């Protein structure tokens, strides 16, 4: 048997969230009291990495996750089955990373998740972009913007 790697086209969704100010306020407030996890065995080398299922009952975050999930459902229609039905997406994990100068994320993917997303809470135009390793496409971070993508897509951020 032979395994052959191929590059393929994959769509990503980039959009703005109308309640970005509320999300920013909530995130910045909660980061002050969060319990960061160790990054020893992680691809993410950020100044802060919250726990994997951060604030699951927070209504502001639940609304953000629901909105992005609905946008993925609308534009990508994942989970389609041959009989015409669909399995709806679920948001399994939700965490925050704080990247300071010199921080980065090594190339990684979010398999086995069908989709994943990044949401930029606080950003400047010169911050490191979210880079898709297969295509080389880079997304410049902008406050209040999300980027949703298939979980198998390789992503990274370079140190700034």
Give each language-model segment a name.
Residues 1-87:
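Non-heme Fe(II)/2-oxoglutarate
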């Amino acid at each position: 048997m032979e395994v052959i790697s191929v590059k393929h086209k994959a769509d990503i969704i980039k959009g703005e969230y109308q309640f970005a100010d509320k999300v920013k306020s909530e995130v910045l407030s909660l980061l002050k009291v969060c319990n960061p996890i160790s990054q020893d065995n992680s691809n993410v080398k950020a100044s802060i990495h919250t726990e994997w299922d951060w604030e699951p009952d927070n209504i502001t975050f639940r609304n953000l996750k629901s909105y992005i999930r609905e946008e993925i459902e609308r534009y990508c229609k994942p989970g389609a089955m041959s009989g015409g039905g669909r399995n709806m997406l679920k948001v399994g994990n939700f965490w925050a990373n704080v990247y300071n100068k010199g921080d980065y994320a090594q190339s990684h993917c979010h398999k086995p998740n069908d989709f994943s997303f990044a949401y930029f809470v606080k950003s400047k135009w010169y911050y490191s972009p979210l880079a898709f390793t297969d295509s080389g496409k880079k997304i410049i971070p902008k406050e209040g913007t999300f980027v949703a993508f298939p979980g198998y897509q390789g992503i990274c951020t370079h140190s700034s």
